Regions:
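Flexible, glycine/charged-enriched surface loops at secondary-structure junctions
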Residues: 148-152
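Glycine/Thr-rich phosphate-binding loops of Rossmann-like dinucleotide-binding domains
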Residues: 41-42, 164, 198
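Juxtacatalytic substrate-recognition/specificity segment
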Residues: 161
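Conserved active-site beta-strand element of glycosyltransferases/polysaccharide synthases
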Residues: 1
Length: 242
């Protein structure tokens, strides 16, 4: 865990060496990978297929940061999250962690996560943590969700490559990489949101891993690329609430 892969080297028909930046080498017949799909074609060696590398380099991401504020109130609002459409603020969504589970927060307190959709290196991403916390407090106050005096603590978490971008060339680039993997590297299994460059929720991501393991251990022929191909909006529910 927490190890960066330098190279995945194919040295026999279905045998690989996974070489870490630390210098450690692991030999494997099957490789399950959650590294960004964008990086996979340039990580697998040898790879003379330039088209796959260009497709990988063309895949784009949207980055993300969350400002978590601990409030001295028992419950700010009943929703799990609220999408913000107010043009006067930069926050895109507010999570209420205690509404997901009361065990996520201390008794009598509330923790709200203000989520900002950003790009690495832009103004918000580069802003100092204390200024981001001040911004979040002021925006919650502007939205009439809290009183400034109720804030006890603030934390900032930055998440690169949080969202795969679906641009006009998305399907073409994914198809090129998928075809290459399924024909030349059948024993490499990309999984998860980053690993497949697909807007998978947690359940979808777990399912791609489960199906990959079943393919390896039980010899099944599950196509993980068929997981989550429906076009329904993931957070939509029958009641219309999120």
């Amino acid at each position: 865990l927490n190890s960066k892969v330098k190279k995945i080297e194919k040295y026999e028909t279905n045998s690989y060496k996974v070489i870490l930046e630390s210098g450690d080498v692991f030999e494997a017949e099957h490789v399950i990978t959650s590294m960004p799909l964008a990086s996979l074609p340039s990580t697998i060696y040898p790879n003379e297929n330039k088209e796959t590398k260009l497709s990988g380099e063309s895949l784009k991401f949207r980055d993300f940061l969350s400002v978590a504020l601990v409030l001295d109130v028992e419950d700010a609002f009943p929703d799990n999250w609220i999408y913000i459409h107010e043009p006067g603020v930069k926050v895109g969504r507010v999570q209420n962690y205690g509404s997901w589970s009361p065990y996520l927060v201390k008794e009598g307190k509330t923790c709200l996560g203000l989520e900002y959709f950003v790009n690495i290196g832009d103004e918000l991403w580069s802003m100092e943590d204390d200024k981001l916390i001040d911004l979040a407090i002021n925006e919650l106050k502007k939205l009439s969700l809290i009183k400034t005096s109720s804030t006890l603590e603030g934390y900032v978490v930055r998440m690169p490559k949080a969202y795969p971008v679906y641009d006009l060339d998305y399907s073409k680039n994914i198809d090129i990489i998928e075809k290459w993997l399924t024909t030349e590297h059948k024993n490499i299994y990309p999984i998860g949101r980053n690993g497949m460059h697909r807007y998978n929720n947690q359940d979808h991501s777990m399912m791609t891993a489960v199906l990959s393991v079943r393919n390896i251990i039980l010899g099944e022929k599950n196509n993980v690329w068929k997981v989550n191909v429906e076009e329904d909006y993931h957070e939509e529910v029958n009641s219309g609430r999120s």
